[in-house]
Curated annotation (Swiss-Prot):
Keywords assigned by UniProt, alphabetized: Cell membrane, Developmental protein, Disulfide bond, Fertilization, Glycoprotein, Membrane, Receptor, Repeat, Signal-anchor, Transmembrane, Transmembrane helix
S-S pairs: 132-152, 146-161, 164-192, 170-205, 199-214, 218-231, 225-244, 238-253, 256-267, 263-280, 274-289, 294-307, 302-320, 314-329, 373-391, 381-404, 398-413, 419-433, 429-446, 440-455, 458-471, 465-484, 478-493
Subcellular location as annotated: Cell membrane
Cytoplasmic side: 1-49
Molecular function terms, GO-annotated: hormone binding
Organism: Caenorhabditis remanei (Caenorhabditis vulgaris)
Gene behind this protein: egg-1
Protein name according to UniProt: LDL receptor repeat-containing protein egg-1
Role, per record: Probable receptor which is required for the oocyte-to-zygote transition although its exact function is controversial. Seems to be required for fertilization probably by promoting the interaction or fusion between sperm and oocyte. Conversely, shown to be dispensable for fertilization but required for the formation of a continuous and cohesive eggshell chitin layer by maintaining a homogenous distribution of chitin synthase chs-1 at the unfertilized oocyte cell membrane.
């Protein structure tokens, strides 16, 4: 039988052996390799098929692993956001009337108990007021929220307002209805405006309503300002805010409105009541306050309801009843340690000093506050005309400068040329001629203090530095300044020697050392063997300098 032409080119599939599983996998990998090399990367043709497949598998596994990790991070961020409401750097409360003291949570200062930095009867009313969006550590009182005045640097206190405390408000924007194409007033928030923004030829409201309140005739529930013809609601009268340019809306007020406080016939606006600054002569606008009214990062509330500035806490001046704002402050010691007989004076700087310090001539603010000048340390300038007598330090006598109004401190002075002629024991210093009795008496008559050096002994009531052979005035003992080279005048100080005799001093917690309060931190505590409280006080000053803390 003869073959048909072309029959030799037919393939007999029945005779072909099937591929194994491994051959199929290898075949698929070769196909994938060919696709990659021809589609995106020609260099893949030189790589083994197995390597390419393994790389692809690792990429897929990485993507799958990233999905649960992303979900975990998102959940953690939400949880942290919820917990962040506890960021309260000023949570100082009286242990009897407020919750337990919280801790601050700022940077490496975490864990410092604020109770060690504030008196126990003074609160900062944590949780009250409005936290500025751009600076959460800056808190403003609720009375300044949505009042038409930007108190936060970012103006966030005037954003998203649902209700205004200002005299005028308008809708924040006007949206168009997409179906009717008509403008409909959609009011998610309000714009709060003070009276000075009305009728000033500047459109602040989207609908221009702030420029349309000036009318010839006002409605029954309005009154007209004579200065700019603005029609304002009657509730704007006697609210402590001059809404009319001539102030006529705040004259002859028998009663005050909108939370304003009455002083005589004057109304103090609500935002100035319980703000730590007395507007009334009797300070009644700062009494009977609570945390809602006395809130803010610069305020402090005394247990008796007095609102004070936070800078007034532990400043050496009693602002709360019975001086509770000065009790148990860092660097203080027990009040029982002071002698009840120690007299104190309030000088022209409104700070209190012991009479011995105030009348020794070293505090200029007290020169006219003393009933009697120290007979040894000072010179008494007589009262002349309407002036009061003054106590000046003795080194100012015969220095060529008239410190007394009548020049009494420069009278009866021996000229330098005649010094030692009639009295051989006289000596000179700083263009002065002094008697020998003025040497080594524990009083600095010379500005360079040379009259108290090279002393074998000192007068009674003074201090002798054995290492330096010099005499010091008694008031220099434990004043925070080491006059002796060995520091012996500042060692083993008692509470009364430190705080009982000096102002503006800091008593180290356990080392019986006194330091000047403005020098105790540099920036860390300079106290020997500084305690937790000493360190916390200096940490507080770090926060203060960054605008984030109490004092």
């Amino acid at each position: 039988m003869s073959q048909q032409p072309g029959s030799d080119r037919r393939v007999n599939f029945a005779q072909e052996e099937p591929m194994t599983l491994g051959e199929k996998i290898s075949h698929r990998m070769d196909q994938f390799k060919e696709m990659v090399s021809s589609g995106c990367c020609s260099c893949a043709s030189r790589c083994p098929s197995v390597a390419i497949v393994l790389i692809l598998a690792l990429v897929i596994l990485g993507i799958l692993a990233a999905i649960p990790l992303t979900l975990m991070l998102t959940s953690s961020a939400q949880r942290m956001s919820t917990d962040s409401t506890d960021l309260s750097p000023y949570s100082i409360r009286h242990p009897k009337f407020w919750p337990k003291t919280d801790k601050i949570h700022f940077n490496d200062l975490d864990g410092i108990p604020m109770s060690s930095l504030f008196p126990p009867n003074v609160s900062t009313c944590s949780g009250f007021g409005f936290a500025c969006t751009g600076a959460v550590h800056m808190i403003i009182p609720s009375s300044k929220r949505c009042d038409g005045i930007k108190d936060c640097q970012d103006g966030s206190d005037e954003e998203n307002c649902k209700e205004c405390q200002s005299v005028f408000s308008c809708r924040s924007h006007v949206e168009e209805d997409s179906k009717t194409k008509r403008k409909t007033k959609v009011l998610p928030t309000l714009i709060c405006l003070t009276a000075e923004k009305l009728c000033n030829d500047v459109q602040d409201c989207p609908d221009g309503s702030d420029e349309s309140v000036c009318k010839s005739t006002c409605s029954k529930d309005q009154f007209k300002c004579t200065g700019n013809n603005a029609c304002l609601p009657t509730s704007a009268k006697c609210d402590g805010v001059n809404d009319c340019t001539d102030g006529s809306d705040e004259k002859n007020c028998n009663e005050c409105q909108k939370g304003a406080h009455k002083c005589g016939k004057q109304c103090i606006k609500a935002s100035h009541v319980c703000d730590g600054v007395a507007q009334c002569a009797d300070r009644s606008d700062e009494k009977e306050c609570d945390c809602k009214s006395c809130s803010g990062s610069d305020k402090a509330l005394c247990e008796d309801g007095t609102c004070i500035k936070r800078t007034q806490v532990c400043d050496g001046k009693k602002d709360c009843t019975d001086g509770m704002d000065e009790e148990n402050c860092p660097g203080s010691c027990s009040i029982e340690a002071f002698s009840t007989k120690t007299k104190q004076l309030t000088c022209s700087d409104e700070k209190r000093y012991t009479e011995s310090e105030a009348c020794s001539g070293v505090v200029e603010a007290c020169e006219q506050s003393c009933p009697k000048c120290h007979p040894k340390l000072t010179f008494t300038c007589p009262a002349v005309g309407g002036s009061q007598k003054r106590c000046i330090r003795r080194s100012k006598v015969c220095d060529g400068i008239n410190d007394c109004d009548d020049g009494a401190d420069e009278k009866n002075c021996t000229p330098i040329k005649e010094c030692g002629i009639e009295n051989a024991s006289q000596f000179t210093c700083d263009r002065k001629c002094l008697d020998a009795s003025r040497r080594c008496d524990g009083v600095w008559d010379c500005e360079d203090k040379s009259d108290e050096q090279n002393c074998q002994q000192c007068s009674s009531g003074s201090i002798r530095c054995a290492a330096d052979k010099k005499c010091l005035p008694a008031y220099t003992r434990c004043n925070g300044v080491a006059e002796c080279s060995d520091g012996s005048d500042e060692q083993k100080c008692s509470c009364e020697e430190c705080l009982g005799a000096h102002s503006n001093t800091y008593m180290c917690n356990e080392s019986n050392r006194c330091l000047k309060r403005d020098e105790v931190c540099s920036p860390y505590s300079m106290c020997p063997n500084a305690t937790y409280t000493d360190k916390a006080y200096c940490a507080a000053l770090v926060l203060k300098n960054s605008g984030r803390f109490p004092y």
